[in-house]
Amino acid sequence: MNFETVIGLEVHVELKTNSKIFSPAPAHFGEDPNANTNIIDWSFPGVLPVMNKGVIDYGIKAALALNMDIHQKMHFDRKNYFYPDNPKAYQISQFDEPIGYNGWIEIELEDGTTKKIRIERAHLEEDAGKNTHGSDGYSYVDLNRQGVPLIEIVSEADMRSPEEAYAYLTALKEIIQYTGISDVKMEEGSMRVDANISIRPYGQEEFGTKTELKNLNSFNFVRKGLAFEEKRQAEILRSGGQIRQETRRYDEATGETLLMRVKEGSADYRYFPEPDLPIFEIEDAWIEQVRNSLPAFPKERRAKYVGDYGLSDYDAKQLTATKAVSDFFEAALAAGGDAKAVSNWLQGDVAQYLNAEGKTISEIELTPENLTEMIALIADGTISSKIAKKVFVHLAKNGGSAKEYVQKAGLIQISDPAQLLPIIQQVFADNEKAINDYKGGNKNAAKSLIGQLMKATKGQANPQVAQKLLNEELEKL
């Protein structure tokens, strides 16, 4: 029997606010344990939550970016459970009226076609703290993360393969990153994924029993975990067994999923309206104000890059993978840069430099203006492509004017035959063997000579002019 896979994803996105959702404590990552806490986070008796308006702004922004309707009378609920990293014994979340609902995004499949994935809801909530189990037999609680604002984005069960789930996460991450509401860094926990998967015989409308894969910390592990779970569930059903509703985790070492616990239902959490927070009215003017702050998203930018600038689909995807690079590209074009040349540099030397340094484009000194200036120096023959690589590294580290650096460092390309001919003659005199080889019919000896010429000029000889002059001088031998 063949089975159809059914996948839905729950994505927790940490919102990039300065303070927490209900307390004034900082919401920054990487501080010493319990440094970013106050009495609200510790749930001292009598303290009350105070809503961070910026969190609602970000919630509206996410909902609009994901084509969602917005509950304009929004409230919070209590989700009751006990765990050491949750001192209140309940989490403030949203249950029946999330800030956003009935949304969708479009994903691109492997064959180049697109598919619309519906999004059921997006709700705001507070994050829990973090437990660390020490080798000394004690468990330690860090409440820095307690109260950090989250938005949980819950898809419909519209994905039919691990590859579709991967494509959905990639598209969702791009959109969220473009809004600026989160840095979506999975390695820092600001984007976390839970995956629900079931299988059913082809043609059956009713969903099968699902299992949940919890806290998957990379898109690749999401894909691998779902692929294993597809196979595991199919083997159980083919052998006459039944699937239990479980929460499982993906073991990165073995590539398998392992049982964590039997899954609870929403009734186990005894949701009820949060009595310490009012209903928040989100007026039309508020929504429009946020809508006007949204940037152009990747799909729109890619269409422009292909249609208006003549770039390939591949180039357009690479340039729009992050908003910072896309903004840099557009600023470079506004400064007079050639689209293809700027694209080539951003995908080539710039990308290699950023990877090697472990930095983003906003963390180096290169600017759209000085990159465009450098490309113009290549185009007009002032510097060679080889020298440009040296100029680029200087600009990335120090910034400033490309033209001024080239002049100050003496990197201007030598194109004057009167300057090059004496150097060529000296190269001939210093390389008698190559000259004799050339005279003997070995035309490859000319490659050695042009290499020696470039070395003698420290790479500053204009390659085209140098090659032409050298060939002419060789013909005279």
From Swiss-Prot:
In Pfam terms, one family for this protein is GatB_Yqey
Record's keyword terms, sorted? ATP-binding, Ligase, Nucleotide-binding, Protein biosynthesis
Question: What's an example GO BP annotation here?
Answer: glutaminyl-tRNAGln biosynthesis via transamidation
Q: What is its EC number?
A: 6.3.5.-
Q: What class of enzyme is it?
A: ligase
Record GO terms (molecular function): asparaginyl-tRNA synthase (glutamine-hydrolyzing) activity; ATP binding; glutaminyl-tRNA synthase (glutamine-hydrolyzing) activity
Reaction(s) catalysed (UniProt annotation) = L-glutamyl-tRNA(Gln) + L-glutamine + ATP + H2O = L-glutaminyl-tRNA(Gln) + L-glutamate + ADP + phosphate + H(+); L-aspartyl-tRNA(Asn) + L-glutamine + ATP + H2O = L-asparaginyl-tRNA(Asn) + L-glutamate + ADP + phosphate + 2 H(+)
Function field: Allows the formation of correctly charged Asn-tRNA(Asn) or Gln-tRNA(Gln) through the transamidation of misacylated Asp-tRNA(Asn) or Glu-tRNA(Gln) in organisms which lack either or both of asparaginyl-tRNA or glutaminyl-tRNA synthetases. The reaction takes place in the presence of glutamine and ATP through an activated phospho-Asp-tRNA(Asn) or phospho-Glu-tRNA(Gln).
Check the record and name the HAMAP family matching this protein. GatB (MF_00121)
Family per record: Belongs to the GatB/GatE family. GatB subfamily.
Q: How does it assemble?
A: Heterotrimer of A, B and C subunits.
**Protein name (database record):** Aspartyl/glutamyl-tRNA(Asn/Gln) amidotransferase subunit B
